[in-house]
């Protein structure tokens, strides 16, 4: 008799490469702390450079780099690729206008739309300040007028009664003094000797002598 065939199931053998990948432990390496930025982003620096230079024909790449070195003290060689990328994207988005050249090579300036927006913002701020100022001035004027009116009223009210009371007694005193000497001057006409002189002609008796001349008439008898 023949032995029955024994069926053997296939055993999966793991490949050595896969086993190694799964068994590799993750090594926790200490992460280096990121150094703090000593300058703002490249996009901001380049935009400020074009904004402050304000060249009519536009600012060239070299002029922008010189500005970044002087203003932010950065290594322009390391940031060269970032500067060029920003210039290209800014021109595509309409943030900057390329006046000369192609790509990152050429001259760049702010578009007219950006300048108009800045002018509009400035003009909007000015009327607000001007509107606030007259209100303060109006408040001050109202306060001044209110403060002045009671002062003037009190001054006029006080002056009128003071003038009346002081003037009346002053006028009454000289009137009493003038009336006092008048009765003293009344006895002066009594002492006048002039009427006595007028009686002197009555004492002239020699004028009666012609009456004695009538005596011869008696002789006729």
Curated annotation (Swiss-Prot):
Region listing for Disordered, in residue ranges: 1-43, 113-221
Organism, as annotated: Chironomus tentans (Midge)
Disulfide cross-links: none
Keywords attached to this entry: Chromosome, DNA-binding, Nucleus
GO molecular function: double-stranded DNA binding; nucleosomal DNA binding; structural constituent of chromatin
Cell inner membrane found in the keyword field: no
The protein's name: Histone H1C
Gene3D superfamilies for this protein: Winged helix-like DNA-binding domain superfamily/Winged helix DNA-binding domain
Major location category of this protein: nucleus
Lineage of source species: Eukaryota, Metazoa, Ecdysozoa, Arthropoda, Hexapoda
Residue ranges, compositional bias (Basic residues): 141-167, 175-221
Family matches, as Pfam families: Linker_histone
InterPro entries referenced in this protein's UniProt entry, alphabetically: H1/H5 (IPR005819), Histone_H1/H5_H15 (IPR005818), WH-like_DNA-bd_sf (IPR036388), WH_DNA-bd_sf (IPR036390)
Family indicated by similarity: Belongs to the histone H1/H5 family.
Matching SUPFAM superfamilies: Winged helix' DNA-binding domain
Any GO CC annotation of this UniProt entry: nucleosome
Function comment: Histones H1 are necessary for the condensation of nucleosome chains into higher-order structures.
GO BP field: chromosome condensation; negative regulation of DNA recombination; nucleosome assembly
Localization per record: Nucleus; Chromosome
The H15 domain, residue ranges: 38-112
Keyword Cell wall biogenesis/degradation assigned: no
